[in-house]
């Protein structure tokens, strides 16, 4: 446990280092902390904090800098949160409005990057347990059918079905009507379980087409995707750009996305804002970074995650409320009756 004096000095050191990026010396800490304490006493406290792994001494400086563990203590116990400034709040409110979910994800990602000057990341709202609002079939040619799936979020998804026989327009309409009447609004997992029991009693052409449609829909909605914006802004962050090998690994991760998707899916289960500082992410490309995330919801169900990837030396006091408010506004916009109303027609 840190005593009050050690906490005050650690808080002062982290805030100063975030502000200017320079190692903080004992004399500066004495002046800024407001404590009635000598530089020698400050040095003793700094030595204790260093032994605890909360601060470190760069070889080229007599001052100290916070470690990832030091940032964690700062964020969990010492951070003073303030309301987001009005200009940034207005920018978030004007940038997030009811739209197709995919366009909204792209807008949120860009907005997060613009406001923080780091990389904005958003998982698009596609879930394996997703439902559909409406299904249509369109005959393209013999044995080739276009499945048009409208999700509850308003996205229109097109999937090509290659069938074992030709279907008449009447058969396609009959199958679509059956699915829409019996299963609209139900999860694909629930539909799959029901179909296993019902297929035997259905006409063969309906059963085969329904099976193909649900399989294609599940395959598509189980594939989460991630939108990354502004990653090139990290090139101007000295702590990251000074190590080219680490920077290359970071950009490889942005390009291939699998590891980042896994991390964001973990944070989807959290309540409110989550932070992964340095090695806490378990991903070596992020060892010098902090990832700040928050889940967003549709009708009370968490359907995606958004956040910011930046250096560990970031203005947590500002970034955390930006991520939190953006997630809340995306959730609100997704639940708006206007959401998805201008999704492009598939016909």
From Swiss-Prot:
Which Pfam families does this UniProt record tie to the protein? HrcA, HrcA_DNA-bdg
Alphabetically ordered keywords of this record: Repressor, Stress response, Transcription, Transcription regulation
Q: Which GO terms label this protein's molecular function in UniProt?
A: DNA binding
Q: Which residues form a coiled coil?
A: none
Q: Which Gene Ontology biological process is one annotated for this entry?
A: negative regulation of DNA-templated transcription
* Gene3D superfamilies per the UniProt record, alphabetical: 3.30.450.40, Heat-inducible transcription repressor hrca homolog, domain 3, Winged helix-like DNA-binding domain superfamily/Winged helix DNA-binding domain
Task: Please describe what this protein does.
Answer: Negative regulator of class I heat shock genes (grpE-dnaK-dnaJ and groELS operons). Prevents heat-shock induction of these operons.
Q: Which family does it belong to?
A: Belongs to the HrcA family.
> What is this protein called in UniProt?
Heat-inducible transcription repressor HrcA
Q: Which organism is it from?
A: Laribacter hongkongensis (strain HLHK9)
Which lineage is the organism of this entry classified under, starting from the top rank?
Answer: Bacteria, Pseudomonadati, Pseudomonadota, Betaproteobacteria, Neisseriales
Q: Which gene encodes it?
A: hrcA
